[in-house]
UniProtKB/Swiss-Prot annotation:
Superkingdom classification of source: Bacteria
Keywords: Ribonucleoprotein, Ribosomal protein
One GO cellular component term: cytosolic large ribosomal subunit
Coiled coil ranges: none
Keyword Ribonucleoprotein: yes
InterPro entries documented for this protein: Ribosomal_uL13, Ribosomal_uL13_bac-type, Ribosomal_uL13_CS, Ribosomal_uL13_sf
Stated role: This protein is one of the early assembly proteins of the 50S ribosomal subunit, although it is not seen to bind rRNA by itself. It is important during the early stages of 50S assembly.
GO biological process: negative regulation of translation; translation
Self-association state and partner proteins as the record states: Part of the 50S ribosomal subunit.
Protein name: Large ribosomal subunit protein uL13
Record's keyword annotation contains Ribosomal protein: yes
Organism expressing this protein natively: Actinobacillus pleuropneumoniae serotype 5b (strain L20)
Family: Belongs to the universal ribosomal protein uL13 family.
Length: 142
């Protein structure tokens, strides 16, 4: 019996919508990363993108435990000398709530071209509305 290897052109991808309201950030992100990679499928192949498309709504209502709301700090660099910037979780939720989930999931995906391809299948929206109704996404309860 030969080992099954999925081919990129034969992979069937589904669309799912996830409501992030009240979900813990890390627990949500691990499940999203797992599904973006395709590890929940029997035909999972490490070097082939077998994952599904995921739409996350209500990113502004994601929760963190403990004092992370004020203690968790996000850092980035502007590219200029001395341009290191930071913001707490609370400030990031106020400024750009989609980025909080995107950063968490991106860190859990493989680094390199395959990981970037997987990350492109994640669509995050701050509010309750998304513009992917034509794809007829199924509701995924995490």
């Amino acid at each position: 019996m030969k080992t099954f290897v999925a081919k990129p052109e034969t992979v069937k991808r589904d669309w799912y919508v996830v409501d992030a309201t009240g979900k813990t950030l890390g627990r949500l992100a691990t499940e999203l990363a797992r599904r973006l990679r395709g590890k929940h499928k029997a035909e999972y192949t490490p070097h082939v993108d077998t994952g599904d498309y995921i739409i996350v709504i209500n990113a502004e209502k994601v929760a963190v435990t403990g004092k992370k709301e004020t203690d968790k700090i996000y850092y980035w660099h502007t590219g200029y000398v001395g341009g290191i910037k930071d913001a707490t979780f609370k400030e990031m939720i106020a400024r750009r709530p989609e980025a909080v989930i995107e950063i968490a999931v991106k860190g859990m995906l493989p680094k390199g071209p395959l990981g970037r391809e997987m990350f492109r299948k994640l669509k995050v929206y701050a509010g309750n509305e998304h513009n992917h109704a034509a794809q007829q996404p199924q509701v995924l309860d995490i």
